[in-house]
């Protein structure tokens, strides 16, 4: 599935993918890639969408996240979904990897389940390695075994991870200038076993994770 903008509060359920998913040509902004769905339009706080009981066994690869001229925009990718949703009972077995050219997006997020989380996740499993190997100059990079970047309060319950989480991406242009929106995290690379980066001042609960 590509970008789903069909409404709010819908469910993607019981889907399975065994084919590789590759992004070889990208735009300067809003690059989204996932084993089940690229983008589930799930960033609304009150009426999020749900991805439930889905399984991905195909490798997810972004080989050219953005063009060399790009300095702004977003790139999000995950074994299940690029963007966020409510995640229930999803499993990823495929390797999730970003590599290749360009200065990169101002925000680059990669996770074993999703590049972004803003709602609860229950019963999710990731067994695919998460590799952020673009090797070039992005500004904000978030690499997580389950989720790349958390932006709203959430709870992770009964989730599991058995995979390598590696980030070798460099972030080193205009780093001394900072930004008005996020001066503390300008020129930062974050990697975490569960979540790559958690936005400040949000409530996070982790229960029964192994």
Enumerate the language-model features and the residues they cover.
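Surface-exposed loop/turn motifs in large extracellular/passenger domains
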Residues: 1-210
